[in-house]
Amino acid sequence: MATSKSGGSSKNGRDSISKRLGVKRSGGQFVRAGEIIVRQRGTKFHKGKNSGLGRDYTIFALKDGIVEFKTYRGRKYINII
């Protein structure tokens, strides 16, 4: 009786969907109040003047203005000036 062994199962073949994180507005760019500047996991960037921090660590503009990235004592801050 001719038999055929069953094929082995693969442990690969999965991937998660991308989360679209990162900087959405560059330094020197004009933004309106409420616009998202950075989407991040944790505080890679910290909120500065006229910027807010969402519960998922998203940084957004509180007022209309120009985006400014500043480093102070090893931390990156985002200001709207």
Swiss-Prot record:
Residues 1-11 have a biased composition (Polar residues). Keywords: Ribonucleoprotein, Ribosomal protein. GO terms for biological process: translation. InterPro entries: Ribosomal_bL27, Ribosomal_bL27_CS. One of its GO terms (cellular component) is cytosolic large ribosomal subunit. Residues 1-21 are annotated as: Disordered. It comes from the Bacteria. It holds the Pfam family Ribosomal_L27. SUPFAM superfamilies: Ribosomal L27 protein-like. GO terms for molecular function: structural constituent of ribosome. HAMAP family: Ribosomal_bL27. Belongs to the bacterial ribosomal protein bL27 family. NCBIfam families: L27. This is Large ribosomal subunit protein bL27. It comes from Borrelia hermsii (strain HS1 / DAH). The gene is rpmA.
